[in-house]
């Protein structure tokens, strides 16, 4: 059965607090960008469609290259906020497009949208078609300048909303949210309780425990003590979500700082409305249908005194009053927040459920480098615990870092101070460390790697690496071979049971099996312009202090003497010496006067 779930991942935040030229959601934790962690979790839910809303083209490029089945949609630079981000995805939820081959449309302003053929007064709950249940049974139209992309075609009935900068949401929680029926509700959000909720949106409930609204931290009154916070994760009925976002966008446009205060002409027929002369700059219209602090936007503080006055002056639902935007200066970008729909639903008698979790540290977003480090530490602890339960011995979890992309086998031993990253794979019985750094490499069975750095290389079964060896990209170390202390190897093949024990540089070389490279050998592979290859055949024994000037070839079973400089090829089984006659001067030190 095809899934009825669509997933929208919001990745359009500017991330200014990261103080980085890299988009926030592309910052790595445990080997992957934050957005990749979110996408990996989302894909496990097997949705019929996944959409990422982006602003920076680098985010789009990464997703196109890494997750080709994910649709990417550009969020306009003209309007900000999570509400508009989700709104941007609605047409593509309803389209027949699957995967990012569908052309992205960057909407430059809200003027590009034709949001049903109705007036701005539809932001009044009294006239809202959410009250008309029959109107929600069929499809709705959303148009862009490029034409109708929906055409009343069937579309996913539920939308799960995730954030690209919240990478640690447990899959079990998402699974519960998706599988739990909405019943009589139009959606459900995930909440958690914090001892110090400062900086997070608070969940306000009515006397019956129903969620009434989400209040931004800056709008919390001193007497309000609320420690239940909104995590941002939520699931909504697609039709209700679309309808609410349509109306809220209209209100947002109508009440932006560049618009005049709502006049009588803007109000619903036969409804009272406060006129312009009663308004002040940057005022909005708000419904006065409830006695509690329910407004269209949780950006604005509405005191009990204002509502008591509203209750006395306006007794029937759908009437409007002007209010002063007491925090307008704090919201200079005029964001359209997704959280506004919670109050909007409540004002229309529609319920939003909640799932409350105690895993608060897994649901808080990353906004700066401090939170980035904290999040990576949490994820690293999870990764280490998982591998320990799988059968990997990790002697010092506190000093070990393992990327989420690393693969380990049973009975691997990891000693203190190790960093394993990228697409590294380590086979059974390997001993890693102490103080080894391995990235994007294969480490075979029963291999020993101690105090070494290995990058993009392959180490076959039984090899011994280190201490203090540096294995660079493109290197293959054969079975049961040895690379010893202070050896650097680059772009070379070392055959089975060969040894490079100490103090050597091997570059661009092919070394056969059962070869012994003497101490202090240098493969001079660079002529100032080009790199050249050195070939050492099976069974060769080289003396200490040799220099091989590439290109050069040494035949099978040949020997070289200590201190030799090999510039010409050596035939099989030969001995090659660079012989300089030794001259000894008797009593030289005495004659020099050294005493």
UniProtKB/Swiss-Prot annotation:
**Keywords in alphabetical order:** Acyltransferase, Cell shape, Cell wall biogenesis/degradation, Cytoplasm, Magnesium, Metal-binding, Multifunctional enzyme, Nucleotidyltransferase, Peptidoglycan synthesis, Repeat, Transferase
Per the record, which residues fall in region Linker? 370-390
Q: Which organism is it from?
A: Tropheryma whipplei (strain Twist)
One cellular component GO annotation, for this chain's record?
Answer: cytoplasm
Family membership noted in the UniProt record: In the N-terminal section; belongs to the N-acetylglucosamine-1-phosphate uridyltransferase family. In the C-terminal section; belongs to the transferase hexapeptide repeat family.
**For this protein, what is the EC number?**
2.7.7.23, 2.3.1.157
Q: Where in the cell is it found?
A: Cytoplasm
What positions does UniProt annotate as the active site of this protein? Answer: 502
For the keyword Endoplasmic reticulum, the answer is no
Q: Which residues does the annotation say bind UDP-N-acetyl-alpha-D-glucosamine?
A: 10-13, 24, 75, 81-82, 201, 216, 230, 367, 472, 490, 505, 516
In residue numbers, the region (Pyrophosphorylase) covers 1-369
What is the official name of this protein in its record?
Bifunctional protein GlmU
Task: Please tell me where acetyl-CoA binds in this chain.
Answer: 519, 525-526, 562
Could you mention a single GO BP entry for this protein? regulation of cell shape
The protein's annotated catalytic reaction(s) are: alpha-D-glucosamine 1-phosphate + acetyl-CoA = N-acetyl-alpha-D-glucosamine 1-phosphate + CoA + H(+); N-acetyl-alpha-D-glucosamine 1-phosphate + UTP + H(+) = UDP-N-acetyl-alpha-D-glucosamine + diphosphate
Quote the subunit structure annotation: Homotrimer.
What is this protein for, i.e. what is its function?
Catalyzes the last two sequential reactions in the de novo biosynthetic pathway for UDP-N-acetylglucosamine (UDP-GlcNAc). The C-terminal domain catalyzes the transfer of acetyl group from acetyl coenzyme A to glucosamine-1-phosphate (GlcN-1-P) to produce N-acetylglucosamine-1-phosphate (GlcNAc-1-P), which is converted into UDP-GlcNAc by the transfer of uridine 5-monophosphate (from uridine 5-triphosphate), a reaction catalyzed by the N-terminal domain.
Q: Which cofactor does it need?
A: Mg(2+)
Sites binding Mg(2+) sit at 165, 367
Entry keyword Transmembrane: no
What is written in the cofactor note of this entry? Binds 1 Mg(2+) ion per subunit.
Q: What class of enzyme is it?
A: transferase
Q: Map out region (N-acetyltransferase) in residue numbers.
A: 391-595
Q: In which pathway does it act?
A: Nucleotide-sugar biosynthesis; UDP-N-acetyl-alpha-D-glucosamine biosynthesis; N-acetyl-alpha-D-glucosamine 1-phosphate from alpha-D-glucosamine 6-phosphate (route II): step 2/2; Nucleotide-sugar biosynthesis; UDP-N-acetyl-alpha-D-glucosamine biosynthesis; UDP-N-acetyl-alpha-D-glucosamine from N-acetyl-alpha-D-glucosamine 1-phosphate: step 1/1; Bacterial outer membrane biogenesis; LPS lipid A biosynthesis
